[in-house]
Amino acid sequence: MDIPEDVIYLEPSAGGGSFLDLLPRYVALDIAPEDERIEKQDYLKYETEKTDFITIGNPPFGKRSKLAIDFFNKAAKMSDVIAFIVPVSFMKWSVQKNLDFNFALNSYTYLEPESFSSNGEPYSVRTVFQVWVKKGSQYDNGINLRLTKQPPISHPDFEIW
């Protein structure tokens, strides 16, 4: 993906600022920032006129991924690209059907279960890094790995539900 030098990145759940050293220009938000470069702000209440951010982060998951879905859909209003570390449930139709349909799943990479730490100890959580691209944007390359319909729940040999 070719990214213009003047792009501004948005990190909506910046926490300790893990991504910030890698980003040339950014807006970083968190409700409990752990780094002076991060603005104390509830992302879900954040307002901006800008609509072409590249949003990158590791949003809070919430019960049944609800918070992560809310973060995604908020990002969809102000971004051309959304690159999030999310629960593996984001690979399922039951989650993808709730995400803004103006976005195509461009790529994904499953992360190692112990990619995170908590209090200095490895923390096991099943996650995937997904890159979503707004359809028709300058980043749209025609790739769409998104599930566009519910998978079948029956088979000649058995029925799932």
Give the ranges of each region predicted by the language model:
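Class I S-adenosyl-L-methionine-dependent methyltransferase catalytic core
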Residues: 1-161
